[in-house]
Curated annotation (Swiss-Prot):
Catalysis performed (reactions): tRNA(n+1) + phosphate = tRNA(n) + a ribonucleoside 5'-diphosphate
Lineage: Bacteria, Pseudomonadati, Thermodesulfobacteriota, Desulfuromonadia, Geobacterales
Name of protein: Ribonuclease PH
PROSITE patterns the record matches: RIBONUCLEASE_PH
Subunit (UniProt): Homohexameric ring arranged as a trimer of dimers.
Gene Ontology MF annotations: 3'-5'-RNA exonuclease activity; RNA binding; tRNA binding; tRNA nucleotidyltransferase activity
Amino acid sequence: MRSDGRNPASLRNIRITRKYLKHAEGSVLVEFGDTKVLCTASVEESVPPFLRGKGGGWVTAEYSMLPRATHTRSPREAAKGKLGGRTHEIQRLIGRSLRAVTDLTLLGERSVLIDCDVLQADGGTRTASITGAYVALVDAFQWLVSQGTIATLPVREAVAAVSVGIVGGEVLLDLNYIEDSRADVDMNFVMTSSGRFVEVQGTAEAEPFTCAQMDDMRSLAMIGIERLMAIQQEVLEQ
């Protein structure tokens, strides 16, 4: 039994609340247990300079944590004058994951900017951000269709992400902070609804892991992502 009472193959309580903000074209509050992330999707009628005149659009992301999202206050990165390496890595991952399932040609020469702001962190903020940002992105696309700006949703398939790890010799799904801090191995999987991988991140903190252990983690991640996508679909149909 895990610290929060789950079995090894259980996700935390997952909740995705759509239309959380008034002004954004797409917005959700995504909750993975005690991890809470506000994801917004904003439409801009322009593209980066390297895409001008090419007929395609762009999807990009920014990620940040509120100063008191964690146990002790962390200074705002804006106050430091630069983004940290972890922030750069995570926001690039979110952007890549969403572009992997978007037909940028159908979007036309416009951009969707995703903002993922961590309100409360208890492990898995990047996986929660990707899972929630997908729903916010679809809502922004649906808004564009409703305005007659684009003819069809430029979404090829769904995308979601989850963490897995080895803690005390046991493979666990969707690690919380306590589990993540004790993990011998920590992995993040980003997958599409067709069962393809967008990204796999894995690190051995102590003992290196075997192919068999990696297969076990992959299998558990695939089960978790299938459940997450069912939740995404259910929420989008409401």
